Every structure is written in C-alpha cells, then in structure tokens.
A protein has these predicted regions:
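Long, low-complexity intrinsically disordered regions enriched in Ser/Thr, Asp/Glu, Pro/Gly
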Residues: 5, 18-20
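Primary mode marks residue(s) on the alpha4-beta5-alpha5 output face of response regulator receiver
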Residues: 21-195
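Sec-dependent signal peptide recognition
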Residues: 2-8
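N-terminal signal peptide c-region/cleavage motif recognized by signal peptidases
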Residues: 13-14
Length: 195
C-alpha cells in the first residue's frame, strides 16, 4: 500500500503542471460532485470506501479498502473508473508506455459503470485517436457502454472472442501485451461515421 501511495503522490505532482509550465485550471466541479462522479464508476460496496482521485491525480478522499476510483482520464470526467491495485499498476504501465507481461498477468479487476471513451478494440494506441471517423486503418471503434474489466493471462484470454459485437464478454486489444477481458453490462455500440 505504501508503494501505491508513493505512485499516487508522484502522479498527482506531475499532473498539476501543464506542458508549458503553467498550473492547470481549477475544476468547475465541487469536491463533493467530483467524489460522486468517481463513485458512480463502481458498486457502492467498493466505491464507498475507495480512495477517490480526480482525473489529474489529486486525492479527493483517502480510502480504507484496496480500491481507487477516479473521475476519468480527462477534464470532462466522462469515463470514471474504479480499479483494484493490480489494475492500477497495469494502467500506470499502459499510460507510461512500459511493457506488460501478459503471459504471467495476475488477476485484476476494474469497473466502468458509466462507460468509457470510444476506442478501437484492436489497437491500444487508439485511446487518443479521433474515434468518430472510420478510415482504412480503423477496426472496431466502439462505445463499450457500462462494463467491468478483468486482467487475466493470455492462456485464458485466447479462448475468448475479440469481437465486441458478438454478445457477451470479449477481449479488448487482442494479441497485444495489453489485452484484457471486457464484460459489458449493456449493449456495445459502434462509434464511427461512414464517409
């Protein structure tokens, strides 16, 4: 847990400064509204006692369980998540461009009950792409809707479809070190316009 808090503090410090060195603008949301947004990502049995972070890593509330709920990945706060410690470490590696040992991936779990930003199911780098225009190099851009996610070793994941429209669970980012199981709790919808 101590290692986790050090990571959170370093993440928080690094995210309070813009690329040009200026301070990031203040949030238009009250602290209680931000906590409510973050808690909406998971069931109350997890989020009530979780550590709550804003999108930039600011600690809004220290928790008493091993979960972290955040307001999302950007200032719009449209994709809050609740992550266990294994998923939090996975996410930090993903965002930092580090390697992940998918063959020996320990079990991890996360909730995104408000959904996520649309991504290409096949391409991890699509997280920051323009997801509303389908081009020749885009695959399954989709809105995953409310879902749970599980980290599992490749030997388990290779038995599961990667088609987000097949119905039921599917593997996101298949055949990459970042593949993980998506468990939708609502319909998965395409997220692009045909041009």
């Amino acid at each position: 847990m101590q290692k986790y808090l050090v990571l959170v503090v370093l993440f928080t410090i690094s995210n309070h400064i813009c690329a040009d060195g200026s301070a990031k603008p203040a949030s238009p949301y009250s602290k209680s509204a931000l906590i409510k947004i973050a808690m909406s990502a998971g069931p109350p049995s997890i989020s009530l006692d979780a550590t709550i972070l804003d999108y930039d890593g600011t600690i809004l509330r220290k928790g008493t369980n091993q979960w972290v709920c955040n307001t999302g990945g950007d200032p719009q706060r449209i994709n809050p998540a609740c992550l266990d410690e294994v998923w939090l470490a996975w996410n930090e590696r993903f965002m930092a461009g580090k390697k992940n040992d998918i063959e020996n991936q320990p079990f991890g779990q996360a909730y995104m009950l408000q959904g996520d930003v649309p991504v290409d199911n096949d391409v991890p780098a699509s997280y920051g792409m323009d997801d509303h225009v389908k081009g020749p190099n885009t695959g399954h851009f989709h809105d995953s809707g409310p879902h749970m996610m599980f980290l599992l070793p490749r030997a388990v994941l290779e038995q599961i479809t990667s088609d987000p429209y097949a119905g039921g669970s599917y593997v996101m980012f298949p055949n990459t070190e970042w593949e993980h199981l998506m468990v939708p709790v609502d319909d998965v919808k395409p997220s692009f316009e045909n041009h």
